Every structure is written in C-alpha cells, then in structure tokens.
Amino acid sequence: MELSRIEALYGQVYLEKHSYLNPQYTQKFFDDAVSLMGMRCLCLVDTLDRIVAFSLISHKQRVVTVPALGYDTHDAEQGLYRHLFAALYQELSALGCWLNYSSGAGDFKRKRGGVPTLEYTLLRAPAHSGWMTQGMLKLMERLGSKVTVERMMAWGA
C-alpha cells in the first residue's frame, strides 16, 4: 500500500479542499489503522497502477463506516468521489453490509460554522427485482414523501 500517496490524497480532500482544522493524518496513522486497528483500505487505481482514490473502511458486524477517504482533486472531470462510492457500495452489497453514511456530520459541521444543506441518497431497485423489494421501496417512497424539508430542519438535519 502506497502510504505516501494515501496521505497526499487525504490531504487534498480534508485539508486543502475543506479545512486545515481537520485531523492531519500521517502515513503512520494509515499504517496503524490497517495493521493494528483492523481497518481496510479500498483503493481505485489508474491505468498506470497509481492510486487515485481511497477509502479507509472500518467494519463492525454488518455496519461499515468510512473514517477517512481521499481522491485526486486536480482532475474533477474524472468524478473520482462518485466512482469511489460506487466501488464501496458494490463491495458492501457483496458482503451484505450497511454503510453508516455521514453519521453525526451535520452537527459537527454546524458547530464549526457550516450552513445546513440537505443531502439526498437515491434508492432504486433493479427492474428484475422481486415483488417484495419493489413493495418495500414503494412503502419507503410513501413514507418518505411525508418528510418535508421543514420537518428535516426542525429535526436538526
């Protein structure tokens, strides 16, 4: 694992793009996370086998969190963030796991002066999925349609 590249990609996203107030993880941190803390690193590589995106994965029972990620921000046309999460979702699906997505991030950002912005996640069942899956998604659609932006903001979203 190219720890220097992973550290650099993390820095591009969390430090350069967002804020130098974020944790400044080092190569040693990433090495310890994998070798001592049991985390894994999912990496996307380009045609030259160079890491262009990564996500650090913490897996507890059937729930996965991503405590750190990074990608090459110098080439926005590649959509590396979307590719990284597509690869992550594909792996989670194969493992039968759930992703704890942005847990607590809203409160964390508000305390640092962030402006609340709603995030959306699209759920779509494949056309060939069974009636039970289709039915569950229809139920979720009905329940979700009752949740308004105003309610979400009142709940602290």
Protein language model regions, located:
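A conserved beta-strand-loop-helix scaffold within acyl/acetyltransferase catalytic domains
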Residues: 1-76, 157
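Arginine residue identity/basic-tract feature
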Residues: 5, 12, 40, 50, ...
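Residue-level signal for the start and early helices of compact helical domains
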Residues: 5, 48, 55, 90, ...
